[in-house]
Every structure is written in C-alpha cells, then in structure tokens.
Amino acid sequence: MPNIDVLCHDGSPLGVTVKSIYGDEFRYGIGGSELALLTMCEAWTEQGHTVRLYNDPFELNASPFEQLPISAFNPQDNRDCLINFRSPNPLSIHAKGMHTWWSTDQYSQGDYRRFAPFMDKIVCISQHHADFFKKVYGIEKAFVVDIPIREKDFIDSENKVSIKNRLIFTSIPDRGLRNLLSIYPDLLREIPDISLVVTSDYRLWGASPQNEQYRIEWIKYMDTVQFRGALPRKKYMEELCKADLMVYPCVYPELFCISVAEAQWAGVYPITSSAGALKTTNMGTIIDADPNTNRKLYIDKTVEICNNQDNLANLRKVMQEKARERFSLERILTEWQTKVFN
C-alpha cells in the first residue's frame, strides 16, 4: 500500500483531529472540508496505507493516523503520494512523491495559477469547482471526486421516524437563513403544521457576534422554530433524521455542500437554489432562480411537496437510494484509487 502524506497550509483544516468531529475539543464540530479530510485519512489508514497529516493538530494521538506540526514536514522524506489539502503550500513543490492537490476551496492563500503546474493531479469536489478553476485560473487538468459521507455517524439514527413537515437548516447562516426567514411566514400560513429546526451557527469556526443576531431574527416564530445552533455531532444527527425537508434558498456559490449531501443520505428531501454546485450535489428539487427576487417560487414548490405526502415519501426514498450509492465512502475510496493513486 502506498504511504500518503497530507500537507495543509492555512485556514480551517489547521488543528482539527477526529475528536474535533464530535465536539470533544473546544470546537463545536467542523465544516465539510475538514470532515472529508479526516474521514478519508481514517479510511486510508483502515485500508492499510500509512498516513501522516501535517496540520498542527490541537492534540497529538487524537486520531487513528499520525498527525504532526506543519514544521515537521520534510520535503525529502520518502513517500509515495503527497496531497496538498485545500490551499497551495510551497513546501511541497520540490518534495518527493507524486504531487496531488486536493482543493476544497476557490479562494485561499497562495497563487493557484502558478502552483498548478507543479502538481501531477488536481482533485476538485464538484464540476462547478473544476469549471471555476478553468475559467478563473486557467487550470484545465482538474478532475472531480465527490466528498464522502461519514457513514458510521448515521448508524444509530437509521430507524428514526421523521416529523411530518419538519424543515431543517444545517448550513452556514449567511448562505440562506435570511432568505428562509423571508418565506417562512407564507409557509406557516399555507402549511399550519410546519416546523423548523436550525442546527448551525458560527461556533463551528469559533465565537462570532453574528450568532445572536440570527437567533433574534427568529424570535417571533419560536412556537414553531427551534434555533438550536451548532450541535454536537450526535445531536445534529438526531435532528437531521427527524426532518422531512431541507428548504435551502442558498445565495452562496457552494463548491459541494456537505449539508445537502448529509440530508439526502438521511432521507431528508432538499429544495434548494441552483447556486454553485447545488445543481449537481442536490438530487432533489432545484429551483433555478435567485431566492432574493423569486420568493414565490420557493414558497409554491415547498407547499406543493408538503401537500402531497405520498409523493414526498416516494421522492425521499428514490433520492436516498441515489445518495447512498453516490456519496458512499467505498465508492469514493475506489475513485481515489483509480484516478489518483494509480
């Protein structure tokens, strides 16, 4: 089995360990990119690869693979594959091993255009992401591999029963929570038994004054809305499996959107905008219209789906089957083996 070094450089991947996923450190959890990083490192280790992750971990020996300070990275160490994760790290340019850049962002530190020629392979996380690289940075050799679902986290939630017309919002608040607030009064009027749980806020990335601002805006609807904010992973899973729909009038050009992928895995039917990669990650209903100027489309489609529960049950079943094939860890490990390591 090839040995794999994963080198980080800046931003959200720094510090995180497998313990971070479950809120066992000082963070409430982690974002989708970090979740993918740790899940894949863990899975590669289970396959028999020797994995070293250089990301300045908050705690040593907190993951089933080795984690080290970035300063410990030696370009001349023997390795089969070097993965630059997220953003370019100049330490890697003349390092030993096959060079792969696993990008999960379109804007971060470093010169993408100048860095790309040093890479043997470039992995993007959606076609939208790869198209952006080509258009903005002139990077034409990138290919796409989905982010996997961390399947083991769903095992205890498999037999949960959803609550009729329960909506869930699990993404970053400023990517569409205010747009959902703008249509919620209409949804409440048309669907009297509707309810909503919000399970995300900025505490995933540390304290932020924006947390309370979003919570306050929903106060008048607290009879039907639970604004729980960032939750420990297990509690988040419980809320996800109680939901019927994820109405996400997103206004941010998502590069993948783990929130929508996890919702589909759990059988929560997504109704989203077509922003960024949502047009491919979402296998439910996509509304190709700006949520800021087309509120009625989002209202009407949500009401239509909620008012036909038999059809919704069928939509959820078909979508979940597709999600469990597409986002399975086994399939994505095979893609990495075929497209990258071979």
Regions of interest found by a model, annotated:
Residues C241-L255:
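Acidic donor-binding loop of glycosyltransferase active sites
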Residues Q210-M237:
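Nucleotide-activated donor-binding/catalytic signature segment of Leloir-type glycosyltransferases, i.e.
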Residues E158-G176, L181, V197:
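Conserved donor-binding/catalytic core segment of Leloir-type glycosyltransferases
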Residues Y269-T272:
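Short hydrophobic beta-strand element within catalytic cores of glycosyltransferases
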Residues G110-D111, K134-K135, F143-K164:
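Acidic anion/phosphate-binding donor-loop and adjacent secondary structure
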Residues L35, T39, T293, N307-F341:
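A charged, aromatic-enriched C-terminal amphipathic alpha-helix characteristic of glycosyltransferases
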Residues R52-D120, C124-D131:
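Extended catalytic core of nucleotide-activated donor transferases of GT-like folds
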